[in-house]
């Protein structure tokens, strides 16, 4: 924002006046009187009482004023930048600003002096009309003008910042008065985490002015070195977006990574619903960095999962500065903290040397796999000359990948191709072979990918963002569509949930396999499974080998004109097919169904019905009865976990919302009555279930005639502090909590505070490893790991992306697809004609 003190009030054009709004600065005298004051404050309505715990470690505690106020001698390129800096400071602290006076040089007529002050500076009650704008431009519709004039209460506050212009043109802070003689306005102050980001940036204003989106003729400091390359205004837009999302839901998480020079390097965020859903779908996660690798203007990295409806869900987004080991390490560590420390069973990434080294360090117990589409793309890139010279190279290469039933078959075909095309000494191919267990289907016998790895990126989850992203997409453009996309995905998930519980699936065949899972699978997955059931009709099995425990069948697939080897272990009830459909998609293929039917089975072995694809993928009920939890900390987090489940169910319909609303209102009243009844804290601690029982009885009486009175005794899972709490000893009483003192935090490395409910002190529950700033962290359903105490009772869920999957099977060409509708007349032959091949 440029503030031109040189313009007189009569010289401002209408366009300038409208564009600047409250930021107009008008001066029409050489030495302004105290009365000529303009209130240029911007109201910040965050209502953000969110606190975030400062983790333990080699850190210093942050106080409100630390490194945030202006410093004498701080330099600025112009008086406009100096004023913008003071404005941001005032926003962070919670007061309004005004330009107190300014002074010109008598010789050059250039401004050489300016004083910016609190809007309550002075002793007289002054009036201005629409911020000193000419009468002709005052709007009668403006509420400020409806009363004729606007009052500006004065308290003789001395808070101000005085800047002077040096001969070299730089503006420096000559004096600064910090103290106010009135209360500040917390409702207008930005959130604590934003305040601390500003504090870190204030050390060097060259970096600070970029973060708060001040205009500058010089090149942005973010474009120098390994820092986040975003335009000046984009970062403030992003920061405002993150603050707004967290104000809507305290479980929204974000983190800002700062370099040693206090420049922003990376930014990460994940919404509340994603963190909640991750507990149910933490088996497979992918990380796509295509937009970073392809040098998009917005270097977006995306963590993606898939829910029970085969809808893709974003589990985290980040803007990263580069593809270095340090950046990826920070990103993965931050994401791991955000989702409660529970690593995924499988993490799929692109083929990258840095990824290969970082993933095992951050996720030692996670199976690291590679996108097959990316492997194939890299083959074409690195062996482009070979591909051009030999038309049969890719067909031979794909045959090795897709049609090698055993490890030795893959190795034999691989080395045969290397010899045939003169690639025995090619280092890239040697390296690719060493990583074969991360991407080759032959080696995926012990992994479940849930449809997350496909042969073409167009079929992959992350291709969804291609509809919204292009090379020149800015942060501002992305933020504009982000909310809409999240809301749409959330509504689609709710629609799928409603269909799942209220609509009966249509049967397509008399197969016992189809019938056995019709009430188990979600509709989306059931339709995919139906394709395999109908496809089994075109398969013919022939037993080739048998021993004491296993039988091997050759299944002829007439639709694909290809044979598939299927192994059946009757003792262990295990079946496997070389097409690897179960490993890649999570449900049995037609070839295995054909063999099971041949072996006289009428139902699918239970281990092949993955819970993640069932209607009960998300646990719908708690079990057990309330137990005595000795600390407020444990009680708070247990209630938060249950509240998340309540939100998930109650948000599906207006009727369920009404039930939950009445129950919560009743519970709050009952709890307040218990807490104010005069009983001492020890009494409450020793009788934690009494209030819960009365609440339950009250809720049942409220809902009589509307809902069933049948009680589901809820058994609480036993809490083991040694297992459920992060590896920092949790206090055993409120008295012990009061004795805790945060360790020191350096500007170079800090987290946002994690603050408990009112009356409790800050708990430091996590320690950082690198320079960063963390947004609020919350206990999540199913994770049972204590990240923090939620600072807000707000149970609104931030919308979540649930991107519909394409459903293109791994070994099937993209130009074929099934369209299963509830049409009993659909012919099996039609399905066969449309079906894609397994390999």
From Swiss-Prot:
Residue ranges constituting the MULE domain according to the UniProt record: 284-380
Subunit and partners: Homodimer and heterodimer with FAR1. Interacts (via N-terminus) with PIF1 and with underphosphorylated PHYA.
Lineage: Eukaryota, Viridiplantae, Streptophyta, Embryophyta, Tracheophyta
Organism of this sequence: Arabidopsis thaliana (Mouse-ear cress)
Region (Disordered): 128-151, 693-725
Domain FAR1: 84-186
Record note on what altering residue 305 to R does: In fhy3-9; loss of dimerization and loss of transcriptional activation activity
Entry GO MF terms: DNA-binding transcription activator activity, RNA polymerase II-specific; DNA-binding transcription factor activity; zinc ion binding
Protein name, UniProt field: Protein FAR-RED ELONGATED HYPOCOTYL 3
InterPro entries with a match to the protein in the record: FAR1_DNA_bnd_dom, FHY3/FAR1, GH10_AS, MULE_transposase_dom, Znf_PMZ, Znf_SWIM
């Amino acid at each position: 924002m440029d503030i031109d003190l040189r313009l007189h009030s009569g010289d401002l054009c209408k366009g300038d006046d409208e564009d600047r709004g409250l930021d107009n600065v008008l001066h029409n005298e050489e030495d302004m009187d105290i009365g000529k004051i303009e209130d240029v404050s911007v109201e910040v309505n965050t209502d953000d009482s969110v606190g975030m715990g400062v983790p333990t470690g080699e850190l210093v505690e942050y106080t409100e004023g630390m490194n945030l106020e202006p410093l004498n001698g701080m330099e600025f390129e112009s008086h406009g930048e100096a004023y913008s800096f003071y404005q941001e400071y005032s926003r962070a602290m919670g007061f309004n600003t005004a330009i107190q006076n300014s002074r010109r040089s008598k010789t050059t007529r250039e401004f050489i002096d300016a004083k910016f002050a609190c809007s309550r500076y002075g002793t007289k009650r002054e009036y201005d009309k629409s911020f000193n704008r000419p009468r002709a431009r005052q709007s009668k519709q403006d509420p400020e003008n409806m009363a004729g004039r606007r009052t500006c209460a004065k308290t003789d506050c001395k808070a101000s910042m005085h800047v002077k212009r040096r001969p070299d043109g730089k503006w420096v802070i000559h004096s600064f008065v910090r103290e106010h003689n009135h209360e500040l306005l917390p409702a207008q102050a930005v959130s604590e985490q934003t305040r601390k980001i500003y504090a870190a940036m204030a050390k060097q204003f060259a970096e600070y002015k970029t973060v708060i989106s001040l205009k500058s003729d010089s090149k942005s400091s973010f474009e120098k070195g390994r820092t986040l390359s975003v335009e000046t205004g984009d970062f403030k837009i992003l920061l405002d977006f993150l603050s707004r999302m967290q104000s809507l839901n305290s479980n929204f998480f974000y983190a800002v990574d700062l370099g040693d020079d206090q420049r922003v390097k990376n930014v990460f965020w994940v919404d509340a619903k994603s963190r909640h859903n991750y507990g149910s779908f933490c088996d497979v996660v992918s990380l796509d960095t295509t937009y970073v690798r392809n040098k998009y203007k917005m270097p977006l990295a995306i963590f993606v999962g898939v829910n029970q409806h085969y809808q893709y869900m974003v589990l985290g987004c980040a803007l990263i500065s580069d593809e270095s080991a340090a950046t990826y390490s920070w990103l993965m560590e931050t994401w791991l903290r955000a989702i409660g420390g529970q690593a995924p069973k499988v993490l799929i990434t692109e083929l990258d040397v840095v990824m290969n080294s970082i993933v095992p360090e951050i996720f030692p117990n996670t199976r690291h796999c590679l996108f097959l589409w990316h492997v194939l793309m890299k083959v074409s890139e690195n062996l482009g000359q070979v591909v051009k010279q030999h038309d049969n190279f890719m067909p031979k290469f794909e045959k090795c990948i897709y049609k090698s039933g055993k490890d030795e078959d893959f190795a034999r075909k691989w080395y045969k191709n290397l010899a045939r095309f003169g690639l025995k000494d090619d280092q890239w191919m040697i390296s690719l072979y060493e990583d074969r267990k991360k991407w080759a289907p032959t080696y995926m016998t012990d992994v479940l990918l849930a449809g997350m790895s496909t042969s073409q990126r167009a079929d992959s989850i992350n291709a969804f963002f291609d509809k919204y992203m292009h090379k020149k997409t800015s942060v501002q453009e992305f933020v504009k569509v982000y909310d809409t996309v999240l809301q749409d995905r959330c509504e689609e998930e709710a629609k799928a949930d409603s269909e799942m519980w209220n609509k009966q699936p249509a049967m397509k065949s008399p197969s016992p396999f189809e019938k056995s899972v019709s009430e188990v699978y979600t509709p989306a997955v059931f339709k995919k499974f139906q394709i395999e059931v109908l496809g089994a009709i075109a398969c013919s099995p022939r037993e080739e080998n048998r021993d004491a425990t296993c039988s091997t069948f050759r299944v002829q697939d007439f639709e694909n004109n290809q044979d598939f080897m299927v192994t059946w272990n009757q003792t262990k009830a295990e079946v496997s097919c070389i097409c690897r459909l179960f490993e890649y998609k999570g449900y049995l293929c037609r070839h295995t169904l054909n063999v099971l039917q041949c072996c006289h089975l009428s139902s699918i072995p239970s281990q092949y019905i993955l819970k993640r694809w069932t209607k009960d993928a998300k646990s719908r009920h708690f079990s057990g009865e309330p137990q005595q939890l000795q600390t407020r900390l444990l009680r708070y987090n247990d209630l938060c976990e249950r509240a998340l489940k309540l939100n998930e169910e109650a948000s599906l319909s207006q009727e369920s919302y009404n039930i939950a609303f009445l129950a919560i209102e009743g519970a709050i009243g009952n709890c307040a009555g218990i807490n104010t009844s005069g009983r001492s804290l020890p009494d409450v601690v020793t009788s934690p279930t009494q209030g819960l029982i009365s609440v339950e009885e009250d809720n049942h009486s409220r809902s009589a005639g509307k809902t069933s009175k049948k009680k589901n005794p809820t058994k609480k899972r036993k809490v083991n502090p040694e297992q459920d709490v992060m590896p920092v000893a949790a206090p055993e009483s409120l008295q012990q909590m009061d004795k805790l003192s945060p360790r020191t935090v350096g500007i170079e490395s800090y987290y946002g505070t994690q603050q408990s409910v009112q009356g409790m002190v800050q708990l430091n529950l996590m320690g950082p490893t690198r320079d960063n700033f963390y947004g609020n962290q919350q206990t999540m359903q199913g994770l049972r790991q204590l990240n923090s105490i939620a600072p807000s009772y707000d149970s609104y869920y931030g919308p979540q992306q649930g991107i519909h999957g394409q459903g293109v099977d791994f070994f099937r060409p993209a130009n074929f697809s099934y369209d299963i509708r509830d049409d009993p007349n659909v012919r099996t032959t039609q399905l066969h004609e449309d079906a894609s091949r397994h390999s």
